[in-house]
Design a protein with these regions (language model features):
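Divalent-cation
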Residues: 2-141, 145-152, 156, 162, ...
Length: 167
């Protein structure tokens, strides 16, 4: 059991989430997703969670495991072309995970997603949260543009562009 991690999760609350991602940042992130999706046929969702609840924390749930749960809960997998991508941030751990549906995951390697995650985490270490998220959205969008180019006949928005603040 990692007591440092437990303490970090206990001390990282919803107020920290709102301080790091004020309304203006959330709007900028939403606009970045919307702009990105104009250039490809994929779907991007950004979700952020301040900290894990007690039981998952005591079971030492990883950010990756939690991201997979969130991917399912938000139904990112339920897009017409199986090209939904979740960018998940567990704020207490400053850990980013990218979970991609099978349509895009088959084309982009895990290592390529990892590069995006590490780049975002690097920005976060410098307190550049908004720009780090937007950089990640743009990087995911580059992959989606390559494998799922924009189709003017298929422009429906299947996932919310608003950042999902998990409580």
């Amino acid at each position: 059991m990692n007591f440092t991690r437990i303490l970090r999760h206990v001390l990282t609350g919803k107020l920290a989430l709102r301080r790091i991602f004020p309304a203006a940042s959330l709007t900028a992130i939403e606009q970045a997703i919307q702009q990105s999706e104009l250039n490809h046929g994929g779907q991007i969702c950004f979700a952020v969670e301040a900290a894990l609840n007690t039981i998952p924390l005591l079971k030492n749930q990883t950010a990756r495991e939690r991201a997979v749960e969130v991917f399912s809960q938000l139904r990112i997998w339920d897009t017409e072309h199986n090209n939904g991508v979740l960018i998940y941030l567990l704020l207490a751990d400053r850990d980013v995970e990218v979970i991609a549906d099978r349509g895009i995951h088959a084309k982009v390697s895990s290592e390529e997603w990892e590069v995006i995650c590490r780049s975002m985490e690097s920005a976060f270490r410098q307190q550049q949260f908004e720009s780090g998220v937007i950089e990640g959205i743009n990087a995911v969008g580059s992959h989606l543009r390559k494998y799922f180019p924009s189709d003017p006949n298929h422009k429906k928005n299947e996932l919310t562009n608003k950042p999902v603040m998990l409580e």
